[in-house]
């Protein structure tokens, strides 16, 4: 009984499993939509980084360092915290360069 559908019911596309060969084909030719999504995500990242730099130039520097560290933590840069701990002289502006 399990895995059977009532008469005339066609499961939506996302519930049907793809044949392995089809999977391979789909991997080889990525659809345009995913490419566009990736590009827009990259653009968003770039915008965020630029915004951070502008904040550094415009506002008072003490407040800026705190802001930048918060932003960096959101973007998932684990090295930044460790690096600043080891080298206190490292400017927080350059945290964005760390992985």
From Swiss-Prot:
Q: Which UniProt keywords apply?
A: Repeat
Source species, domain of life: Eukaryota
Q: What is this protein called?
A: Duplicate procyclin
Read off the lineage from the record: Eukaryota, Discoba, Euglenozoa, Kinetoplastea, Metakinetoplastina
